[in-house]
Amino acid sequence: ITATATSGSGEGGFLGVDIASTNAADILGGKIKKTEAIINIDGDLTADNISVAANAENSFEKDSLTEVGGLVGKVTELGGGLIPFGELVTDNVKIGYAKLASNAEVNIGSGANLTATGNDTLAEANDDGLREGGALNISAISKLSAEVGAEVEGVEGAGQGKAAGSVTPAGGRTKTNSLSKVMPGAGVSVVETDNNASVTVAGKLNSNGDANVSAHALSEVEAEAGVATIDSTAGSQYVNAAVVVAKIDNTSRVVLNGATQVTGELNALAAAKNEVTTTATAETTKDSLVSTAINVTDAVSTADLTVGGNVTAGKMNIAADNTISNEIQAATQVGKSRFQTKSQMSGGTLNAILGTTSNRGKSAKVDKIGQYFSAGAAINIVDEANSAKVTVQKGAQLTATDSGVDDEGNAVATINISANNTIEDSFMSATSVVNNYATKRGTTSSGGTPSTGTGTQTAALASVGFLQADMDNSAQVVIEGSGDQGTGAPVIKGANVNINANSAFEYDRLGSMIDSLQKDYGDIVEKYQEVPGLLTAWTDALAKSGQYLSNPSVDGAMDVAEAFQNAVDSISVKYADTAMGVPEDLQTLMDDLLAFADVSNYTNFYTAASTAGGSVLGTTSGKEQAQVSLAGSININSIKNNAQVIVGKGADIEASVADGGSVTKGKLDISAAAKQHDVALNGKTKYFIPTISNTGGGATAIGGSVGVHDADVNSLVVVGEGASLVGSDVKLAAENDLQHTAITFGGGKAANQGITGMFAYMEGESNSIISVDDEASINAANKLALNANNDTTISNIIFDRTSAGNTAVGASIGVVDYKVNNIAAIVDNDSDAIRDENEEVKELVNLVNNQLSAEEKAQLGTKATVADEANGKGKITANAVEVNAKTSGIITGVSVAGVTAGASQPNNRGTKIPAQIAGAGSASVNEISGNTAALLEGVEVTTASTDGYVKVSASDDSMIGAYSGAAALKKKGRQASSGGFSATLAGAVAYNEVKTDVTAQIK
């Protein structure tokens, strides 16, 4: 039984509709391109093999849409009012828009009874993650693909004839992308998507072979907006903006509420995959008033699986898997010099400027403003929520009948319950560059064409890069507790049982670059062996790449970067311009290599803002300097990464299988693992080596970089009162793996005064917690082990370098404020923390409660009263009991500030040297608190043999260090001797405040 719905459009269409013959406002006013494939079954089906498949696919591909009056105001509304384009409709505005929905749905009603009598087995997963081949297959697959683009390009001699960037819309009318002197150029892309796949089973499923019940939501969204202007007309001024607004929702859901009987293997899966690429790029190469790019991306991806009925199978895999990758960028360029990187650039703060330009009759005023102000800004705002969740509801019973032993006699899991949320790759950036260069004596270029005659100064250069990224990532398995009457708790029984929650933010930024290089290298290795040194240049680099791929790490990435830098250096620029300039594939290879020169490719969160200026011909007149040069980059990240396994009150989980008249106990593993490896970089650098070009081109240069990095990474296993855990070996594990790196670089040069400040603040929590209530019952024929491990590495690195003709002040401040807790405990975790006298238990209860919702706390019985506890304590029976908590890692803060005043500035020649000040200061502060504890309290422990033991241990091997340095240098005139230097100011402070405890206790 199959339902298939497919919809797609290629270039030349707009939501599948000819824009020339359709009212655009109606389309944007609520019409939606949607595909639906729905199957409803509420009767009896019997066959050897049964396949029920709902497949929906919705795709849209569109490079760009020429502006239409009715679209502009509507897109402004959809973009949240960020850009008021309503009065700025010109030939330079393009809009790209797509609103897509796709839904694949299978509903097996309560009156349905599906029976597959065949004994076919499941195959390996295909590219969509679907396992076919079983006797019974029920699946829903929804695919959504959207490509939206809006590109505006101006040309030399704009407005004369057909422009190179012109388009021919449907209907054959040619519209030229001529750039009016004062009208803006704008590219706007808006995309809204809703992708859903779901399978709901309320009836009966029976299979004599294997069975698959799965939902797959696969979403891929790409939105780009770009504007680039080129004009040779002197005095022209532009406002340029690129805007992307993306709202993405991707959901996969499976519900098993009926009775399911499978002789073979049952695969129940909710799978979501979300790929997001959004880019806003604004670039002007000559006269420009302001260049702006804004990227606002909101993405949600969810995989959710619920079991509420009775499920019996030989073996069963019950999983929710969510996989995410994203590349979200904003960058802008103003001025003559070009800042070109592999990742496109974007920028934008337009609102304050458009009030002037919206009145078309004031072109003279706009032209005048353009002589005094050159600005660029990149704003990137990202909000993501990604989750994978499995819930075993009240009343559910899961039973696996397989022996749990493979053909070679090895133990295999017969019940696998897992929630996996994985950020495979993530890159978010905001970069802005503003340039002011003089082309000849008496002329300036304030981000544009020279204005001659008077040598008018550019009053201000302003460049801003702003990134705000909020990410909430979680993986959760919830085994619900009993109802209010103490009945209905879930029962899970199988020979070997694994219950796992894994939430991972992976660092593998170089993987795609290396793959691309190796592919292109292999394609041409035989064709161009005659190019001297070409093939041997990459030997070391490729070897380092192989080492990195086998064991990805931040340090490994740095090794690769250095190796490829050496390779690029060994192939001179001459090769790129000549030998490599002719064969296209060799140029592609060089592009692959140069990708390693882009520092952003090594980071997850990147901001940079810079201004630059001076004279191309080396002239020295102060008239060629901007009066004020401002550059600021702001990098704000808030990341939550949580992995949780919750075993509710009264839940019964038993690793055992009946074999004839006996019962064989197996292995019960319950674990939560949270992994966060990320790098945030703030400031303009190359290979993480600081340059001093963040601010410049002005008599006074002011620059600042601010990084605020908040990461909460938590792994939690909690077992409620009255729960029963049984197996030969019972293992509970919580694992935190945090490598959080923030790097802030900055500085600049100025003719007279230079002031820079770098500030980076890292805060958050890293908690690895196992909490078992003392009213739970655990029976392990061999060993009970609780292992909490927390490896937290925090690096906060700041470097500031400033030089100026007269006054230079630089400051670097770094603060690390983190709580690191690592606790493994069997205690009264449903007690009120106020009543408990044990500080460690109070802290434990608080930590657990802070991570759980009110509903989740209720599943554990955390609201018990004193009278309730008269029901008695739990009991642990095992040959060996181990409760271990181990904390490790390195927390480092490094800040360095250096300044030079009175350095040999060209405009100091022949002038009286004014008073000069050089001051540098740096501060590095670490405030670290937390507990490492292993607790066994208030529970009866019985060892099963005379050689049994109880071991409780806690250790903290972490290292914490703060390092700070400052240097100030003042030099008079152009003297090279030591006599040219005089007193300076410099100061450095390093401070550690550490409040950590280590406790191992049996009570």
Where are these regions (language model features)?
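Low-complexity, glycine- and small/polar-enriched segments
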Residues: 1-1003
